[in-house]
């Protein structure tokens, strides 16, 4: 929404649990590691099944589990401005019990002065499957320190676009 505190009109569910924040229906996307997402479904239009303020539709995020995503994976990458990124995931199952863990780490110095950022994310899921049903227990943990926005007067911009007028911009 262009106005802080105004509902987005989009309900977001992670494994069937609503993820929108109470104030303004915003979503803390930094809680969900990319390596933990199995699929996403967009359900357009208003539907009372998805609760209040679902005027623009619903987004359903499905996370991985040890039954559908066994094995491990590690991904490392680098980029401009000293960007470093690491992702790992590991899942498996034995009998009716399944497990899946995933973590993402991102750090960069930023494109402007004093704009370094870091994100740490963890996801864990225990699953139980039987002929009569299934149960999942999930844990999400994240810490983010994203910096980079900030106004810059035109006179300072002409000197160097990498400057920042005020800091810290927390």
Regions found by a protein language model. Name each.
Residues 1-3, 15-17, 45-47, 64-66, ...:
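Solvent-exposed coil/turn segments that connect beta secondary-structure elements
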Residues 1-44:
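Periplasmic plug
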Residues 6, 66-71, 95-96, 131-132:
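Short loop/turn motifs that connect adjacent beta-strands in outer-membrane beta-barrel proteins
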Residues 27, 46-50, 75-77, 111-113, ...:
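Outer-membrane beta-barrel domain signature
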Residues 78-107, 112-149, 166-170:
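Transmembrane beta-barrel wall of Gram-negative outer-membrane proteins
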